[in-house]
């Protein structure tokens, strides 16, 4: 069973940005409890050229169901707002 999600942002602070950690909002997940069940699952993003970048959900972000995913390589800026597949 796979779930679609939207890439919201990089994990960042006022002065630093972590390019290989993304904040993702899974569709139809609206609480921290539902999001915590996704920890450890694989995240796939397909680039416009067809390359597939893999990541893993490492923790929940906030209380509205967003999660943090750590990728092998950092995602490019064109991934922001794009869909990912959570397997």
Curated annotation (Swiss-Prot):
GO terms for cellular component: ribonucleoprotein complex; ribosome. The keyword Ribosomal protein applies. PROSITE patterns: RIBOSOMAL_L35AE. GO terms for biological process: translation. SUPFAM superfamilies: Translation proteins. Keywords: Ribonucleoprotein, Ribosomal protein. InterPro entries: Ribosomal_eL33 (IPR001780), Ribosomal_eL33_CS (IPR018266), Ribosomal_eL33_sf (IPR038661), Transl_B-barrel_sf (IPR009000). The keyword Zinc does not apply. GO terms for molecular function: structural constituent of ribosome. Belongs to the eukaryotic ribosomal protein eL33 family. NCBIfam families: PRK04337.1. This is Large ribosomal subunit protein eL33. The lineage of its organism: Archaea, Methanobacteriati, Methanobacteriota, Thermococci, Thermococcales.
